[in-house]
Amino acid sequence: MYKVFVNENVIILTDEIPFGSKINLFDLKKISLIDIISNVKKHNKIFLYHKNFEKLISCFKKKIKVIGAGGGIVKNNLNETLFIYRRKKWDLPKGKIDKGETIDQTALREVKEETGIVDLRIVDFKMKTYHIFK
């Protein structure tokens, strides 16, 4: 399962149909990106389903322009998490991959640029996320 964020709303790409709750399920082959975004804004959460997860991801990526980015969850020795305030929202430091960079290099550079912290190290990979921007 992958989650794709559209502001506070989420598109869930899955190869399993979730049971037990009312869901908004759409066939990715039959819906445009504009309709997907319109529906997720209306319902706050939608599911895009295909029995073959790799085909689902491939089909979804054909509908959008994928831009690689990296960032990090920064914690101090008190286990407090660092957030930055940008575009009128609290967020984690992150940004686009520069040509020739690895995802780790991007994460370290972006966190340093956005927070000023220089003594950084990557401890663990947490997750891959996708976001849709205008």
Locations of regions flagged by a protein language model:
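Active-site segment of metal-dependent pyrophosphate-handling enzymes
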Residues: 52, 116-134
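Short, hydrophobic/proline-enriched secondary-structure or compact coil segments at domain edges
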Residues: 1-10
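Short aromatic-centered micro-motifs
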Residues: 4, 74, 131
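Short, flexible N-terminal segments of the mature chain
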Residues: 14-37
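A sequence-level detector of short linear motifs
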Residues: 12-13, 83
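Acidic, metal-coordinating catalytic segment for phosphate/diphosphate chemistry
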Residues: 30-71
